[in-house]
Amino acid sequence: MATLRKVVKGLVVVVAGVIFSLGARAGDDAPLSKEQIKHFLQTAEIIKSKQSSKGVTHPWRLTLSDGTLTHDASFQPVDEHKAEMKLESGKVELGFVDSYKYNIAAYRLAELVGFDDMMPVYVERKWQGKTGSLSWWLPVKMDDAERVQKKIEPPDPDKWNRQMFRIRVFDELVYDSDPNLTNVLIGEDWTVWRVDFSRAFRRNKELRAPKDLVKCDRQLLERLKALNAGELAEKTKNYLTKDEINGVMARRDKIVATFQAMIAQKGEKEVLY
């Protein structure tokens, strides 16, 4: 499987905003806020289900309804822990974890650093006796694997690249051991989302692919600098261990140091946007 860092022009993202306009509308036809989406995902009745053939964990596509709104969601109950695991790449990982908890942790971390505009809302929910992550189903036309296979170029390369840089930074922060192009979803208007972090949050304190850090969004860098271990621990309680949080903070330090060194060498205009 091609990885994110093998794509030259890369990955992608969305514009920030408090309102999550994903085709979802309230009864008065106003777009739903993220808090309204969270409430819907946690409380709406599940009326239909179908298992996906995509991905390693084969998540479920559930249809939810609260009597006014009907919308789909992705349910991922995987919570696998192994002392040793041979990955698809052929590498062997010790202390392997593949867990829905990391999806929720990634979203909560994203909220802290201003990256949640690039992800669907994730909550925890129980269904058919299993607890898992439930995320808002996104209106997409293809994933990035399909885009690469069909050799489709983005209509706005500069915007694409700027958003690519943001995803690369976040991927280094969470240390996803399985970043692949099927986890990048592209909407009709080329809005893009990064999904599925079930193999993230490794305890490594080194960066996974430091060469991927080329440029950085100014606001994202400032939010990274302000990230606090205590706040992160509180926000991800029951989802991340102390060692996993320490890994995030150590990688944060290295990300910030990397960009500060680049700014000192090249100048701010060449590094930040």
Mark where each language-model region is.
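Non-catalytic, low-structured ubiquitin/UBL-interacting segments
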Residues: L4, S21-A24
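Phosphate/dinucleotide-binding and metal-coordinating scaffold of catalytic cores
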Residues: G23-Y273
